[in-house]
């Protein structure tokens, strides 16, 4: 029997009235059922919830058993990078487009969430990536990503020359527009658009996907998730960047190198009891239906 949730966090950055209305509906419904609810501060201000318990994402991670993220996958990614540092489960209400990470239908959210609160759910642990920008062995900048870490030019598109080492062994060099380093969670995001493979979320694997390589032989490469990926660069005159989930940018300067490896943190993702990963793929990607 799954554990029951005792305290709930409400998270999101609503961009339109419908998403804000979902936050308001969930707040009043959850408090009406007797749950302690901690609301992300900006949402509480937008809804004028003067007497609500409010806090930052870190506060929610420390105090809540379950964080409910209302929005699209972008909202989920932004919240989950922080919430993954804490012992808190996360579930999403889809107010975006595709919604690979946000399972709950906003029109049916109360019924679905009610079943989850009664212990009818499944839990998945999704690993994160950690990226470090280093010089002479010293770490200068770092971040984490749930979907992908992407090497790309800065403001102007141009070819990049770089070498890739895996577990300190030279793997390949490349001239391309960049490189996508994707988790299984991110394999249905940017990586998929670049021709990368879809990795089932239970796989302990990382995909390296070239972006417009200047050779016909370059292909996506799938490696063990415990591998350490080291990117080294020839001299470059234009800016390079590392982006994490298309939300955080780390500049790369001359003489710096990049190390990407599996983070010690996990996103604890909650799904409704009837969730099916392959049904989600089929519906989101428009795959053909069963023939018989």
Swiss-Prot record:
Keywords: ATP-binding, Cytoplasm, Kinase, NAD, NADP, Nucleotide-binding, Transferase. GO terms for biological process: NAD metabolic process; NADP biosynthetic process. It comes from Edwardsiella ictaluri (strain 93-146). GO terms for cellular component: cytoplasm. It is found in: Cytoplasm. NAD(+) binds at residues 73-74, 147-148, 158, 175, 177, 188-193, 247. Involved in the regulation of the intracellular balance of NAD and NADP, and is a key enzyme in the biosynthesis of NADP. Catalyzes specifically the phosphorylation on 2'-hydroxyl of the adenosine moiety of NAD to yield NADP. This is NAD kinase.
């Amino acid at each position: 029997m799954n554990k029951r949730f005792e305290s709930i966090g409400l998270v999101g950055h609503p961009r339109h009235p419908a998403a804000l209305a979902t936050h308001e509906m969930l707040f009043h419904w959850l408090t009406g059922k007797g749950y302690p609810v901690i609301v992300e501060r900006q949402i509480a201000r937008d809804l004028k919830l003067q007497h609500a318990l409010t806090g930052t994402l870190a506060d929610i991670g420390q105090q809540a058993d379950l964080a409910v993220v209302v929005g699209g996958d972008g909202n989920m990614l932004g919240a989950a990078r922080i919430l993954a540092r804490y012992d808190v489960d996360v579930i999403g209400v889809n107010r975006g487009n595709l919604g690979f990470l946000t399972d709950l239908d906003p029109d049916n959210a109360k019924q679905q969430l009610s079943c989850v609160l009664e212990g009818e759910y499944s839990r998945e642990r999704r690993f994160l990536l950690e990226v470090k920008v280093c010089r002479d062995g010293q770490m200068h900048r770092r971040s984490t990503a749930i979907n992908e870490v992407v090497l790309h030019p800065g403001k102007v598109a141009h070819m990049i020359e770089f070498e890739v080492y895996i577990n300190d062994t030279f793997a390949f060099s490349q001239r391309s527009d960049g490189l996508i380093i994707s988790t299984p969670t991110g394999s249905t995001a940017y990586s998929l658009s670049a021709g990368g493979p879809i990795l089932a979320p239970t796989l302990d694997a990382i995909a390296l996907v070239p972006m417009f390589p200047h050779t016909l032989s370059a292909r996506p490469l799938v490696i063990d998730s415990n591998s350490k990926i080291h990117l080294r660069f020839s001299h470059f005159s234009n800016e390079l960047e590392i982006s994490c989930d298309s939300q955080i940018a780390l500049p790369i300067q001359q003489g710096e190198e990049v190390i990407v490896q599996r983070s010690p943190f996990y996103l604890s993702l909650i799904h409704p009891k009837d969730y099916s990963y392959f049904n989600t793929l089929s519906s989101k990607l428009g795959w053909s239906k069963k023939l018989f």
